[in-house]
Amino acid sequence: MKTQMNYAKEGIFTKEMQIVAQKENLSKDFLLENIACGKIIIPANINHKSLDPNGIGFGLRTKVNVNLGVSNDCVDYSEEMKKVELAHKFDIEAIMDLSNYGKTSRFRDELVNVSKAMIGTVPVYDAVGFLEKDLKQIGAKDFLDVVYHHAKSGVDFMTIHAGINSRAAHIFKQSKRLTNIVSRGGSVLYAWMMMKDAENPFFEYYDDLLDICLKYDVTLSLGDALRPGSTHDASDGAQISELIELSLLTQRAWDVGVQVMIEGPGHMAINEIEANMQLEKRLCKGAPFYVLGPLVTDIGAGYDHISGAIGGAVAAASGADMLCYVTPAEHLRLPNLEDVREGIVATKIAAHAGDIAKLPKERARDDEMSKARQEIDWEKMFKLAIDGEKAKKMFNERRPDDLNSCSMCGKMCAMNTMNQILKGEDVSLA
């Protein structure tokens, strides 16, 4: 089976590439060149028939991913499907099913069947439930069985923590971190490695993993098991050593035509973000970078969507290609629908703010909004806003008597004042 990367290397412009080119207003040659060399990916499993393809990477708009899924404390698949509907409403490009309890295949199959967004999973989360074995009883190649099952079901990309091999694990042990390993998948694999005194199975059998990805054109999202879970741990030896391992794994995937993106931090002081984006691009030869936040402070509990949006905007402006949303419930509980909405909007704002910095053409919508404000065209403002529904609701909660202003400024509306005076009219504030 050929992947999007293989087709690009042969100069074949697939229907998925055509859709992305139209969405991004990019040329055929630009896309072919950058998909062929790995700087742009189009996650598109051959079995995901409902997919509306999107590209991630160089020269493209920053994409947003929404996480959802059940846990052993909250098993309500109907609510998770409502989160999917909400993600679709906001035109989210990627959805990850992070369910880590029970038999998850039915929900995942439904997700692939109904979702136009690309679907991602973390197969190691599903290992215990799928295999019906406790962690210590799972064999190295058992993990690949889970990967195969997910790939066959139509998942477009998978987080695989192949970089935390014995070398990276050794450096982690010497790192004296405050928060150790905060990646769920990474912590599970590390525990398995320690209990079995064995190499990371995804690293040991990486070629077998690539064969699965090739068969279904699954994009590898190389997970950062050693991402910093606190600003204290950011940019340390453990994080960077794993990134080096991921760069080597990226090249091996590219050599056979498997698409790759790299996952990144995490928690990180705002002054370290740009350098980390540049380092990933340098080490991984331009492979798309998919970051969680980064959260720029550790004390924003209840408001981590704000901390994540601040870091995400800086990351996107500095080269990050996809942002994983962060909700107000981060670090506290499974998010509800309102948390998901707040996280989506905050992250879309961050992604767009970054795009204005790196893709000047993306300012056009902002200019239209500014024009609508100058013209005091409320309906146009609501239409252009990222969350126009909330904007309209807030406006109507204290609707002004004179629609040439809002309830904040009333007759002292600066826009209305300037519109009148520049037309040669007198201004009356009485």
From Swiss-Prot:
Catalyzes the synthesis of the hydroxymethylpyrimidine phosphate (HMP-P) moiety of thiamine from aminoimidazole ribotide (AIR) in a radical S-adenosyl-L-methionine (SAM)-dependent reaction. Zn(2+) binds at residues 267, 331. The lineage of its organism: Bacteria, Pseudomonadati, Campylobacterota, Epsilonproteobacteria, Campylobacterales. It comes from Campylobacter jejuni (strain RM1221). Its EC number is 4.1.99.17. Homodimer. GO terms for cellular component: cytosol. Its cofactor is [4Fe-4S] cluster. Binds 1 [4Fe-4S] cluster per subunit. The cluster is coordinated with 3 cysteines and an exchangeable S-adenosyl-L-methionine. This is Phosphomethylpyrimidine synthase.
